[in-house]
């Protein structure tokens, strides 16, 4: 494989069948996004970046999400968000062997680099996961990508920064500061698009497929029902990425 074309989708917040989320048909949004990804014609990996469901979704919700992904015939990976249960995701998506200390942790090894999929579902990033990333990066000249639900930075979204930011952000930043070959850190959680520099890393926050929120509000106040997904093109030396809105 000369290059990887990734579709990053995050913050779906899928509810039970025929249920709307704040008046929004989140299932239809997800189906619409997948249709656009299929029509793109170049995507060879989909990454779901967490908050697949809303408030510990049922297995039925997760099975529906899985069925939609399976229909694309595109390879996919999933990571949990704070609204998800890692245990349920592991069961439904056959990831039991990727559980470690109650959290999901796995990676893809490519000819030109490695992708780590991290678990911040409890609000923090387990330090044993980050220690493994640090060790792997320190032993290789290859480049790496990280996918995690919570950004390791503040995102200038008032509600999220004040109430729902990564709990052990300072510890995580301290370790990331000493790693030089992470080419991109891709996150969700903030229901907004952001690109933020952290030391020598670029942290890229992908907008939600549910809705975007007012970045000045103290409550969850929808500012836009426009949904988006991120396309990432990576070959181990160069990386390009942009968000597509629907």
Regions found by a protein language model. Give the residues of each.
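Extended active-site neighborhood of metal-dependent phosphoesterases/phosphodiesterases
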Residues: 60-138, 168-181, 207, 211, ...
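Divalent metal-coordination and catalytic microenvironments
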Residues: 11, 46, 51, 65, ...
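Binuclear metal-dependent phosphoesterase catalytic core
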Residues: 24, 32, 175, 197-246
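Active-site-proximal beta-strand elements of phosphoester/diester hydrolases
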Residues: 3-16, 112-121, 145-147, 202-207, ...
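Active-site environment of divalent metal-dependent phosphoester hydrolases
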Residues: 15-18, 54-57, 82-89, 123-125, ...
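Acidic/histidine-rich helix-loop elements
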Residues: 10-28, 54-56, 85-101, 160-161, ...
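N-terminal active-site segment of His-dependent metallophosphoesterases
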Residues: 1-64, 138
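His/acidic metal-ligating clusters that form di-metal
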Residues: 33-46, 114, 124-202, 238-240
């Amino acid at each position: 494989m000369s290059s990887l074309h990734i579709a990053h989708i995050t913050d779906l917040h899928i509810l039970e069948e025929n249920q709307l989320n704040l008046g929004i048909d989140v299932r239809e949004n997800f189906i619409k996004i997948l249709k656009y990804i299929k029509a793109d014609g170049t995507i060879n990996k989909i990454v779901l970046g967490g908050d697949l469901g809303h408030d510990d979704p049922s297995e039925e919700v997760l099975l529906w999400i899985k069925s939609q992904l399976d229909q694309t015939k595109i390879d996919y990976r999933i990571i949990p968000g704070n609204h998800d249960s890692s245990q349920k995701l592991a069961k439904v998506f056959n990831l039991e062997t990727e559980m470690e200390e109650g959290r999901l942790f796995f990676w893809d090894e490519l000819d030109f680099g490695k992708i780590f999929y991290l678990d911040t579902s409890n609000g923090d990033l387990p330090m044993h996961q980050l220690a493994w990333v640090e060790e792997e990066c320190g032993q290789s000249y290859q480049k790496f990508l990280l996918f995690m639900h919570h950004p390791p930075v503040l995102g200038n979204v008032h509600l999220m920064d004040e109430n729902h930011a990564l709990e052990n952000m300072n510890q995580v930043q301290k370790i990331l500061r000493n790693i030089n070959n992470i080419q991109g850190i891709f996150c969700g959680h903030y229901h907004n698009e952001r690109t933020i520099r952290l030391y020598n890393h670029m942290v890229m926050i992908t907008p939600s497929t549910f809705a975007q929120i007012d970045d000045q509000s103290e409550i969850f106040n929808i500012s836009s029902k426009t949904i988006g997904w991120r396309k990432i093109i990576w070959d181990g030396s160069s990386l390009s990425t942009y968000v597509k809105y629907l």
